[in-house]
């Protein structure tokens, strides 16, 4: 394990390179315009409820919870965090932090890396300070903005193997974690689990059980060839 980390530290990509490769992940979604992620939401100690996360690309996210008011975030490439609507609380904070990093498909390719950078900067992460290496849920991740063992500073984590956003710690200590990428339940591209931690406690957790609307690039090429 020490040898592995030593090899990783020998080459750590620049922030520009990391944002570029993360932005390029969106190609796998092809011409997908909307996605619905259905699952369950748990907030603090309340019982979990059925919920749907509706994504309209780019940068529009809406969370509908059984028995509750919907919450939404609408952003732009210049302001990825966007404007939030709905009752404040952990669920809305989770949506605000996650939306720029899961709904950037549809931003022009030349602008997408900068939109990701702006979202990280808005959270307070000093992405120009260089990168480090750490682990999250048994996966290696690059850490932008602070030392990986310093959770008091804003920082963005990006999984090394899949170039996907992994964790965002914002000013004030809100800690978003995007876990379990690569599962069919979340169409492989999205995280299956979204968690928001505050003060060392789990404040909100959305778990995806089914994804609808994803049209991958390979699927579209096959359909186009049949026409």
Model-derived regions, located:
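Positively charged n-region of N-terminal signal peptides that target proteins for export
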Residues: 1-3
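N-terminal leader/targeting segments and the immediate start of mature chains
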Residues: 6-50, 54-60, 88, 92-97, ...
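Flexible, processing/modification-adjacent segments and terminal tails
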Residues: 11-20, 80-153, 226
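Short, exposed beta-strand/loop patches in secreted or surface proteins that constitute
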Residues: 27-29, 51-56, 73-75, 126-135, ...
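Mid-chain, structured segments of secreted extracytoplasmic proteins
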Residues: 58-94
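Gly/Pro-enriched, hydrophobic low-complexity segments
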Residues: 69, 134-224
């Amino acid at each position: 394990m020490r040898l592995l980390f030593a090899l990783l530290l020998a080459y750590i990509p620049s922030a520009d390179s990391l944002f570029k490769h993360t932005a390029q992940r969106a190609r796998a979604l092809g011409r997908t315009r909307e996605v619905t992620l259905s699952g369950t939401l748990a907030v603090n100690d309340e019982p979990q409820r059925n919920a749907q996360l509706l994504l309209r690309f780019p940068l529009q996210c809406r969370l509908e919870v059984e028995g509750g008011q919907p919450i939404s975030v609408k952003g732009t490439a210049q302001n990825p965090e966007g404007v939030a609507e709905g009752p404040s609380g952990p669920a809305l904070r989770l949506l605000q932090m996650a939306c720029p990093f899961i709904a950037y498909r549809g931003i022009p390719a030349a602008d997408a890396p900068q939109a990701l950078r702006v979202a990280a900067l808005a959270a307070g992460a000093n992405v120009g300070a260089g990168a480090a290496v750490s682990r999250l849920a048994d996966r290696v991740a690059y850490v932008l903005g602070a030392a990986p063992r310093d959770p008091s500073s804003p920082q963005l984590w990006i999984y090394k193997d899949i170039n996907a956003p992994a964790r965002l710690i914002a000013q004030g200590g809100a800690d978003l974690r995007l876990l379990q990428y690569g599962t069919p339940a979340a169409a492989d591209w999205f995280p299956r689990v979204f968690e928001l931690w505050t003060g060392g406690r789990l404040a909100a957790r959305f778990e995806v059980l089914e994804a609808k609307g994803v049209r991958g690039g390979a699927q579209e090429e096959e359909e186009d060839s049949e026409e």
